[in-house]
């Protein structure tokens, strides 16, 4: 029998409901989580569900997994849609905990939960997140230079830009060092980079944000990343197919790679040209190339062998007959 604890996570507290029962409040701290574990042991909890909150859930998720409790980190949008489907429009922390408990009982982990994060993978994820923050700050400062700043303000902006450039280089060195000194991550990064157009930063992004690569079916992965075109049909109406949702960090990385690969991979360039000749807009064709790249990477990760010439239909590495 599955007994599910729904955990609504905030910065300071954890609201917990077991099997949609009464909600108990714990501190979101080491001490509070110890109390939570004792409570879950008394209630014979076999599974815990919480939402992704941008980082506040990391401590409780890691401690629960250390205690060998199955943890599902659910997408907040899906949980909210589930609550509305159940007729629950109100939103409070205790109510969210009860909704999460019901959600975890109905939905399995197969397509909604990320695999357990290794410490090195989590560190890599945080380094890449910091890099994106610094890059966003750099873009903002560059945009300010076009606003007719006073001399002193312009000097301050340029000083900040120099600091940002130095800090970005430092973070780049850190994540590359992490990849180099981790046997498993290093091998995986080298394997991904055998696919044309995949560079070190892209490989690191895939390792950090798409641990399912090589474990799941290609169709499920394209949907997970947000590269699968969704239908919008009703009756006689046939709406436009469009992508939405998914892991934006991975999707953006593959989109950039797709532009690069069009210059160096003849097969994918021909594929792009065929789509353009059929009247597909340029960005739609590039997204299709990014989807192909993801399938190629999934084949490489699944087989654990470097990328070679591929069969078009199944994206499996072609192995020549031995001489």
PLM segments and residue spans:
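Phosphate- and other anionic-substrate recognition elements at nucleic-acid/protein interfaces
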Residues: 1-158, 162-165, 263, 284
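Phosphate-backbone recognition surface of nucleic-acid-processing proteins
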Residues: 26, 200, 205-278, 282, ...
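Amphipathic alpha-helical interaction segments
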Residues: 99, 156-159, 163, 205, ...
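Non-catalytic alpha-helical coupling and interface elements of nucleotide-dependent molecular machines
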Residues: 102-109, 139, 226-230, 259, ...
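Short alpha-helical scaffolding segments that buttress acidic/His motifs in well-ordered protein cores
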Residues: 103, 124-125, 206, 253-258, ...
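Helix-hairpin-helix/helix-loop-helix acidic hairpins
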Residues: 142, 147-201, 210, 262-265
């Amino acid at each position: 029998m599955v007994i599910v604890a729904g955990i609504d996570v905030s910065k300071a507290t954890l609201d917990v409901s077991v099997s949609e029962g009464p909600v108990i409040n714990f501190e979101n701290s080491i001490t509070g989580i110890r109390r939570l574990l004792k409570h879950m042991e008394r209630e014979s909890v076999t599974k815990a569900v919480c939402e992704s909150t941008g980082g506040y859930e990391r401590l409780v998720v890691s401690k629960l997994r250390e205690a060998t409790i199955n943890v599902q980190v659910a997408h907040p949008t899906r949980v909210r849609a589930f609550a509305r489907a159940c007729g629950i429009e109100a939103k409070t922390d205790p109510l969210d905990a009860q909704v999460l408990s019901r959600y975890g009982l109905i939905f399995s982990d197969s397509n909604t939960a990320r695999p357990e994060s290794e410490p090195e993978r989590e560190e890599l994820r945080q380094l890449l997140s910091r890099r994106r923050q610094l890059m966003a700050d750099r873009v903002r400062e560059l945009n300010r230079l076009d606003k007719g700043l006073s001399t002193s303000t312009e000097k301050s902006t340029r000083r900040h830009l120099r600091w940002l450039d130095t800090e970005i280089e430092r973070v780049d060195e850190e994540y590359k060092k992490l990849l180099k000194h981790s046997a498993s991550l290093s091998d995986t990064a080298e394997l991904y980079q055998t696919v044309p157009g995949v560079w070190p930063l892209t490989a690191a992004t895939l390792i950090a944000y798409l641990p399912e690569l090589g474990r799941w079916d290609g169709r499920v992965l394209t949907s997970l990343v947000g590269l699968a075109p969704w239908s919008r049909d009703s009756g006689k109406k046939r709406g436009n197919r469009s992508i939405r949702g998914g892991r934006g960090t991975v999707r953006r990385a593959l989109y950039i790679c797709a532009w690069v690969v069009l210059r160096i991979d003849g097969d994918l360039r021909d594929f792009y040209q065929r789509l353009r000749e059929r009247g597909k807009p340029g960005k739609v064709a590039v997204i299709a190339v990014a989807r192909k790249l993801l399938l190629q990477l999934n084949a490489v990760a699944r087989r654990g062998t470097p990328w070679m010439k591929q069969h078009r239909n199944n994206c499996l590495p072609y192995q020549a007959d031995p001489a």
